[in-house]
């Protein structure tokens, strides 16, 4: 895993988002930072106990404090926790400000992990202390709770930068298709988050993304084929 993170850091992709309390992830990040001499920005998305009790609040405070101890710059309550606070009737997220305050108290930047698109809308409408939001967004509408056009509109109307996730719809479309769609349809301030298993996948995703942003074709190998004359698959052609 350290090899994977090293590829990203060497290419200037210096932020990681997820549930970062797993020891092997923290160890791999430290190894990659040591090898490259570069620092990774940590965006932690911890599960919080959001029950309305004194014991639960104490537990949530401890979880948020642990995020700081891990070295996180950003702390976004996990969507499975944040969505428990949603009141669609009132258009609010009850008690969310309590947890955002806890995050600020620890010197971290608060945000929201949002699978429900309403979280972005309610956050903006109520002026919650949220600096960014995570939102599922891909060309297939995979796991998105409303149509693609609706999420696109929410992203463009959002008051803060949106961190989009699942651009390849969990492997249901190719990186070329998924990443080009995402980069072409979000704002300059927004982000695309990718999940990778190998350093080779990281290299490919970075090249496709840079090509999309620079409006050029990506420098990728063609598909392999036992027939060396299959020009359409190899990506090679001869000028006449």
Regions found by a protein language model. Name each.
Residues 1-90:
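Active-site beta->alpha loop and helix N-cap motifs at the rims of alpha/beta catalytic domains
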Residues 1-17, 33, 149-164, 168-240:
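Structured C-terminal cap/extension of enzyme domains
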Residues 15-18, 40-45, 75-77, 110-112, ...:
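Hydrophobic faces of well-ordered beta-strands that scaffold small-molecule active sites
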Residues 21, 45-51, 80-82, 115-117, ...:
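Active-site beta-loop-alpha junctions enriched in small/polar residues
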Residues 36-37, 69-73, 104-106, 125-134, ...:
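Glycine-enriched alpha-helix->loop->beta-strand junction motifs that scaffold or abut catalytic
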Residues 57-61, 90-97, 146-152, 175-181:
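Charged helix-capping and loop-helix junction motifs
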Residues 61, 65-72, 76-111, 115-127:
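Eukaryote-skewed repeat-based solenoidal scaffolds used as protein-protein interaction platforms
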Residues 117-146:
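Histidine/lysine/aspartate-rich catalytic loop segments that bind and position anionic ligands
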């Amino acid at each position: 895993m350290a090899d994977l993170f090293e590829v990203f850091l060497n290419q200037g992709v210096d932020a990681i988002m997820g549930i970062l309390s797993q020891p092997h992830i923290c160890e791999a990040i430290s190894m990659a930072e040591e090898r490259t001499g570069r620092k990774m920005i940590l965006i932690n998305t911890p599960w919080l106990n959001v029950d309305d009790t004194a014991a639960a609040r104490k537990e949530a405070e401890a979880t948020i404090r642990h995020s700081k101890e891990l070295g996180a710059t950003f702390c976004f309550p996990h969507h499975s926790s944040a969505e428990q606070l949603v009141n669609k009737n009132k258009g609010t997220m009850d008690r969310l400000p309590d947890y955002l305050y806890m995050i600020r108290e620890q010197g971290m930047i608060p945000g929201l992990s949002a699978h429900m698109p309403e979280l972005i809308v309610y956050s903006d409408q109520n002026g919650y202390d949220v600096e960014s939001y995570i939102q599922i967004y891909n060309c297939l509408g995979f796991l998105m709770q409303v149509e693609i056009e609706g999420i696109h509109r929410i992203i463009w109307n959002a008051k803060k930068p949106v961190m989009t996730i699942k651009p390849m719809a969990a492997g249901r479309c190719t990186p070329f298709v998924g990443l080009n769609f995402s980069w072409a349809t979000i704002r300059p301030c927004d982000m695309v988050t990718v999940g990778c298993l190998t350093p080779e996948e990281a290299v490919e995703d970075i090249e496709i993304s840079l090509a999309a942003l620079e409006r050029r074709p990506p420098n990728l190998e063609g598909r392999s084929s036992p027939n060396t004359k299959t020009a359409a698959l190899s990506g090679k052609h001869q000028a006449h």
